[in-house]
Amino acid sequence: MLRIAVPNKGMLSEPAWNMLAEAGYRLRTNPRQLVVQDPDNGIELFYLRPLDIAVYVGRGAIDVGITGQDLLKNSGTAALEHMPLGFGTSTFRFAAPNESPITTLEDIQGKRVATTFDKLVHDYLVEHGIQAETIHLDGAVESSVQLGVADLIADVVSTGTTLRNAGLRVFAEPLMHSEACLIRSPRLNEQDSRLAVLTRRLQGVLTAHQYVLMDYDIPISKVAAAVAVTPGFESPTISPLHDKQWNAVRVMVPKAKVNQLMDDLYEVGARGIIVTALQASRM
């Protein structure tokens, strides 16, 4: 069976579980379960600490896992990114107290930086020729400055609310942009059929989240103009109607552009425009 690691907690956990459920995989029913076998789909799910997933995958103990790109980079393991998953987006930033004179990357020289991602931060500073002390903390790094442990912090920033509440402000360019991703062991062949099935299923979920199915009627004389507005994934499906002057069109369109596309179609003569959500897909 394909061994898959998923986060047991944290901001990536629930979206990861939901994605796997939408892809047809069985999840745990008891929060104390650490391992779930799904023989019908040929997988075994392991619920692990987010920080540890890349380590297990990199060492080959787990075949694939869902983690953050920042966690993968910080792990320094041999695990390989296989595909981005479109959730858990964040930036990794430096932050200093509002009243601090630290405002540029160069100002970090000789300072103390508290972070959970010590390897990522150390490598970034070395790359930019900055010498600083990196202090590893397992969480709540915002408190380190107030407690006198560090001069500044480096941490994942989603909305910035936590930093502002702690009297901190971000500065300098982001160390990196991150999102959730599927990673694989270097021991697992990229062409492995089990990995291919998982990849198709997850990509199908992503497509269903990003696209909708649009149906509309259009005069035959306006079909070319309508197809120019909604070209579809490959090509729209065009069918004749009882009224021989009209055709029915079915096409996939980006969910984010639905209302604008409906307006544009109406302008070129389309009527009976209907949008249907997708539950799953294989492209």
Curated annotation (Swiss-Prot):
Residue stretches in coiled coil: none
Family assignment from sequence similarity: Belongs to the ATP phosphoribosyltransferase family. Long subfamily.
Known role: Catalyzes the condensation of ATP and 5-phosphoribose 1-diphosphate to form N'-(5'-phosphoribosyl)-ATP (PR-ATP). Has a crucial role in the pathway because the rate of histidine biosynthesis seems to be controlled primarily by regulation of HisG enzymatic activity.
Enzyme class label: transferase
Keyword Cell inner membrane on entry: no
Cofactor(s) needed for function: Mg(2+)
HAMAP family for this protein: HisG_Long (MF_00079)
Protein name, as recorded: ATP phosphoribosyltransferase
InterPro entries recorded: ATP-PRT_HisG_long, ATP_PRibTrfase_cat, ATP_PRibTrfase_CS, ATP_PRibTrfase_HisG, HisG_C, N-reg_PII-like_a/b, N-reg_PII/ATP_PRibTrfase_C
Primary site of residence: cytoplasm
Regulation: Feedback inhibited by histidine.
Catalytic activity: 1-(5-phospho-beta-D-ribosyl)-ATP + diphosphate = 5-phospho-alpha-D-ribose 1-diphosphate + ATP
GO biological process: L-histidine biosynthetic process
Keyword Oxidoreductase: no
GO MF annotation list: ATP binding; ATP phosphoribosyltransferase activity; magnesium ion binding
Entry GO terms, CC: cytoplasm
EC number: 2.4.2.17
Cell location: Cytoplasm
Gene3D superfamilies to which the protein is assigned, alphabetical: 3.30.70.120, Periplasmic binding protein-like II (3.40.190.10)
Pathway(s) per entry: Amino-acid biosynthesis; L-histidine biosynthesis; L-histidine from 5-phospho-alpha-D-ribose 1-diphosphate: step 1/9
Entry keywords, A to Z: Amino-acid biosynthesis, ATP-binding, Cytoplasm, Glycosyltransferase, Histidine biosynthesis, Magnesium, Metal-binding, Nucleotide-binding, Transferase
Lineage: Bacteria, Bacillati, Actinomycetota, Actinomycetes, Bifidobacteriales
